[in-house]
Amino acid sequence: MEGSKASSSTMQVSFVCQRCSQPLKLDTSFKILDRVTIQELTAPLLTTAQAKPGETQEEEANSGEEPFIETRQDGVSRRFIPPARMMSTESANSFTLIGEASDGGTMENLSRRLKVTGDLFDIMSGQTDVDHPLCEECTDTLLDQLDTQLNVTENECQNYKRCLEILEQMNEDDSEQLQRELKELALEEERLIQELEDVEKNRKVVAENLEKVQAEAERLDQEEAQYQREYSEFKRQQLELDDELKSVENQVRYAQIQLDKLKKTNVFNATFHIWHSGQFGTINNFRLGRLPSVPVEWNEINAAWGQTVLLLHALANKMGLKFQRYRLVPYGNHSYLESLTDKSKELPLYCSGGLRFFWDNKFDHAMVAFLDCVQQFKEEVEKGETRFCLPYRMDVEKGKIEDTGGSGGSYSIKTQFNSEEQWTKALKFMLTNLKWGLAWVSSQFYNK
């Protein structure tokens, strides 16, 4: 019973392939190791390298023991031991087997045997660059590689042999020829070295010149960049000046066009537009007159009289005419005439209507005085232009205007004892005479 227990608790230690890490089943020759075999395997190692004293004494102490054979038992646990090169020497060659105390002899023999097997693999690994143990397939692969290496080595050996034979067959003449060639090659080498030194010197000179040229090129690049910036600035200023010049030229051209238009423009016609609207004569769109059917506001009539006074005043100034007996005072819709004989007397050319309009005759006196000024203008024009003639003859003493080219009747410019129709027609004829006078002045003084 105890033997069975001891047998079931025994641990088997196995090895793995150092290339593919597959578990190995060792050959039976590793299980039977005698003293002679151990000495044969360890002899090369002891002659080439110094063995550790402890290991030698341990092997000599255990060399007289009887060989043993490992038997596999059911229920035995197995443990893989890592390769010896990946562990220290002490740990690689030390094994601890756990079992019953009563089976101490068997455990000691197994431990010694495994230690010896591990040492053998260490010896094999130390002799080559390959770690041991190896499985059969890895061993075959290794052998193929070694065969290939052997063939290469043999080929090299053959080549060396042939070279040696050629050298041995060479005579003294060939040796002298080779010596001459060697001297020539040495001279050639010296010449080439000298040329190389000259080239190196030239290279240094060229490098220095290149640095100078690069510095000069950099300076020129900077100057070029500066010139480019200055050119761009000048170009920008030129474009701005060109734009300003074109703008000024356009302004001058526009001003010239406007000047030409102004030269061709009749200032009096542009300023004083005399026309008619039905039975009314108009000046600058202000109606001068009044009808029962069209009761024009007195503000509009006063404004029309103001424009009429301004027109006659401008024509007289253009001709250098000074009126006798009266002086025109253009004052908008409150224009009037001053009597030159009585400075305190003013004749208003404006009216507000009402009852006072029918009893106050100053407005009528002012209109008759204005008609007198128009007659003086006509007479002044006739002095220099005998053919000048107004379309409607004026009778200043009666204060009437005759329709010489039409019905032949005369119409009073006064409002008292007169109808609005006749008064309006008289004012229309007066504006027509002023329009003719304006046209004559424009033709005579257009270029002055």
UniProtKB/Swiss-Prot annotation:
<feature type="modified residue" description="N-acetylmethionine">
    <location>
        <position position="1"/>
    </location>
</feature>
<dbReference type="GO" id="GO:0035032">
    <property type="term" value="C:phosphatidylinositol 3-kinase complex, class III"/>
</dbReference>
<feature type="modified residue" description="Phosphoserine; by AMPK">
    <location>
        <position position="91"/>
    </location>
</feature>
<comment type="function">
    <text>Beclin-1-C 35 kDa localized to mitochondria can promote apoptosis; it induces the mitochondrial translocation of BAX and the release of proapoptotic factors.</text>
</comment>
<dbReference type="GO" id="GO:0032473">
    <property type="term" value="C:cytoplasmic side of mitochondrial outer membrane"/>
</dbReference>
<dbReference type="GO" id="GO:0071280">
    <property type="term" value="P:cellular response to copper ion"/>
</dbReference>
<dbReference type="GO" id="GO:0005829">
    <property type="term" value="C:cytosol"/>
</dbReference>
<dbReference type="GO" id="GO:0030425">
    <property type="term" value="C:dendrite"/>
</dbReference>
<keyword id="KW-0051">Antiviral defense</keyword>
<dbReference type="InterPro" id="IPR040455">
    <property type="entry name" value="Atg6_BARA"/>
</dbReference>
<dbReference type="GO" id="GO:1905672">
    <property type="term" value="P:negative regulation of lysosome organization"/>
</dbReference>
<dbReference type="GO" id="GO:0060395">
    <property type="term" value="P:SMAD protein signal transduction"/>
</dbReference>
<feature type="cross-link" description="Glycyl lysine isopeptide (Lys-Gly) (interchain with G-Cter in ubiquitin)">
    <location>
        <position position="435"/>
    </location>
</feature>
<dbReference type="GO" id="GO:0001666">
    <property type="term" value="P:response to hypoxia"/>
</dbReference>
<protein>
    <recommendedName>
        <fullName>Beclin-1</fullName>
    </recommendedName>
</protein>
<dbReference type="GO" id="GO:0038066">
    <property type="term" value="P:p38MAPK cascade"/>
</dbReference>
<dbReference type="GO" id="GO:0033197">
    <property type="term" value="P:response to vitamin E"/>
</dbReference>
<dbReference type="GO" id="GO:0042149">
    <property type="term" value="P:cellular response to glucose starvation"/>
</dbReference>
<dbReference type="GO" id="GO:2001244">
    <property type="term" value="P:positive regulation of intrinsic apoptotic signaling pathway"/>
</dbReference>
<dbReference type="GO" id="GO:0034198">
    <property type="term" value="P:cellular response to amino acid starvation"/>
</dbReference>
<dbReference type="GO" id="GO:0010613">
    <property type="term" value="P:positive regulation of cardiac muscle hypertrophy"/>
</dbReference>
<dbReference type="GO" id="GO:0005856">
    <property type="term" value="C:cytoskeleton"/>
</dbReference>
<feature type="region of interest" description="Disordered">
    <location>
        <begin position="47"/>
        <end position="66"/>
    </location>
</feature>
<dbReference type="GO" id="GO:0000045">
    <property type="term" value="P:autophagosome assembly"/>
</dbReference>
<dbReference type="GO" id="GO:0007040">
    <property type="term" value="P:lysosome organization"/>
</dbReference>
<dbReference type="GO" id="GO:0006915">
    <property type="term" value="P:apoptotic process"/>
</dbReference>
<dbReference type="GO" id="GO:0042802">
    <property type="term" value="F:identical protein binding"/>
</dbReference>
<comment type="subunit">
    <text>(Microbial infection) Interacts with murine gammaherpesvirus 68 M11; the viral protein binds BECN1 with higher affinity than cellular BCL2.</text>
</comment>
<keyword id="KW-0256">Endoplasmic reticulum</keyword>
<dbReference type="GO" id="GO:0051020">
    <property type="term" value="F:GTPase binding"/>
</dbReference>
<keyword id="KW-0132">Cell division</keyword>
<dbReference type="GO" id="GO:0050435">
    <property type="term" value="P:amyloid-beta metabolic process"/>
</dbReference>
<keyword id="KW-0472">Membrane</keyword>
<dbReference type="GO" id="GO:0051607">
    <property type="term" value="P:defense response to virus"/>
</dbReference>
<dbReference type="GO" id="GO:0048666">
    <property type="term" value="P:neuron development"/>
</dbReference>
<keyword id="KW-0175">Coiled coil</keyword>
<comment type="similarity">
    <text>Belongs to the beclin family.</text>
</comment>
<comment type="function">
    <text>Plays a central role in autophagy. Acts as a core subunit of different PI3K complex forms that mediate formation of phosphatidylinositol 3-phosphate and are believed to play a role in multiple membrane trafficking pathways: PI3KC3-C1 is involved in initiation of autophagosomes and PI3KC3-C2 in maturation of autophagosomes and endocytosis. Involved in regulation of degradative endocytic trafficking and required for the abscission step in cytokinesis, probably in the context of PI3KC3-C2. Essential for the formation of PI3KC3-C2 but not PI3KC3-C1 PI3K complex forms.</text>
</comment>
<dbReference type="InterPro" id="IPR038274">
    <property type="entry name" value="Atg6/Beclin_C_sf"/>
</dbReference>
<feature type="region of interest" description="Required for membrane-association">
    <location>
        <begin position="423"/>
        <end position="448"/>
    </location>
</feature>
<dbReference type="InterPro" id="IPR007243">
    <property type="entry name" value="Atg6/Beclin"/>
</dbReference>
<keyword id="KW-0053">Apoptosis</keyword>
